[in-house]
Amino acid sequence: KTSTRTRCAFEVAARDQGAGATYLEPSASQIGHKESIKDTARVLGRMYDAIEYRGFGQEIVEELAKYAGVPVFNGLTNEFHPTQMLADALTMREHSSKPLNQTAFAYVGDARYNMGNSLLILGAKLGMDVRIGAPESLWPSEGIIAAAHAAAKETGAKITLTENAHEAVKGVGFIHTDVWVSMGEPKEVWQERIDLLKDYRVTPELMAASGNPQVKFMHCLPAFHNRETKVGEWIYETFGLNGVEVTEEVFESPASIVFDQA
């Protein structure tokens, strides 16, 4: 997949540590097209000390890791976004007076993909009070939920999944969301997703429902919070929404820590 923040973060980190970095863009690479993942892994593993992969299927990054012979970092797949979790955990720790195992956060929106899955597992592994607020049809898979509960038994984490957005955010210190339509999905799903998720928009009212005047808003970005992008303008013209998963008022408010997070 294409990338802005993930690519820049890895390249800056590598250079800060004195390492070199090569970027293979999707349109210029033969990975999976003329050369198998297995063969690509064995070639790149002989040239590089580590590989970061950002793409669609989790099985691809796992196959790279199996055959490369060097560390492989998951920069994002459809299922997980572990490097974003490092940033999210650090950001919550920086913006809270409590340790993470005494911190509550909620994720509201479509929770079936990488951010919903990863935040649920993150919270469970760190012993946090983690809530998912979404229609049941958009909850993480049964396997992900089971893994979260298994981790919670070891850490003392509290896991809540609810269809009530206000219930999900009550008492939390942080409210997370993400885009409602993921990269690669067709435009035709927008109407269905808006109908399902209109009550899970992060608005000033939802922030206030936390009952916490210090509650913070988080989003891994990019966000559709106004009409200043081609997609944002298309959404406004087609559906009449100025801002989708989060309103401009929340995104630009003092409660928003998305740029620290990014």
UniProtKB/Swiss-Prot annotation:
L-ornithine binds at N114, D178, S182, M183. GO terms for biological process: arginine biosynthetic process via ornithine; citrulline biosynthetic process; L-arginine biosynthetic process. Changing A151V: In strain: CCUG 24846 and INS MA3008. GO terms for molecular function: amino acid binding; ornithine carbamoyltransferase activity. SUPFAM superfamilies: Aspartate/ornithine carbamoyltransferase. Gene3D superfamilies: Aspartate/ornithine carbamoyltransferase (3.40.50.1370). Pathway: Amino-acid biosynthesis; L-arginine biosynthesis; L-arginine from L-ornithine and carbamoyl phosphate: step 1/3. Keywords: Amino-acid biosynthesis, Arginine biosynthesis, Cytoplasm, Transferase. Its EC number is 2.1.3.3. InterPro entries: Asp/Orn_carbamoyltranf_P-bd, Asp/Orn_carbamoylTrfase, Asp/Orn_carbamoylTrfase_sf, Asp_carbamoyltransf_Asp/Orn-bd, Orn/put_carbamltrans. It catalyses: carbamoyl phosphate + L-ornithine = L-citrulline + phosphate + H(+). One of its GO terms (cellular component) is cytoplasm. The record marks E94 as: Important for structural integrity. Changing A146T: In strain: CCUG 24846 and INS MA3008. Carbamoyl phosphate binds at residues 3-7, 30, 54, 81-84, 219-222, 247. It is found in: Cytoplasm. Reversibly catalyzes the transfer of the carbamoyl group from carbamoyl phosphate (CP) to the N(epsilon) atom of ornithine (ORN) to produce L-citrulline. Belongs to the aspartate/ornithine carbamoyltransferase superfamily. OTCase family. This is Ornithine carbamoyltransferase. It comes from Neisseria polysaccharea. The gene is argF.
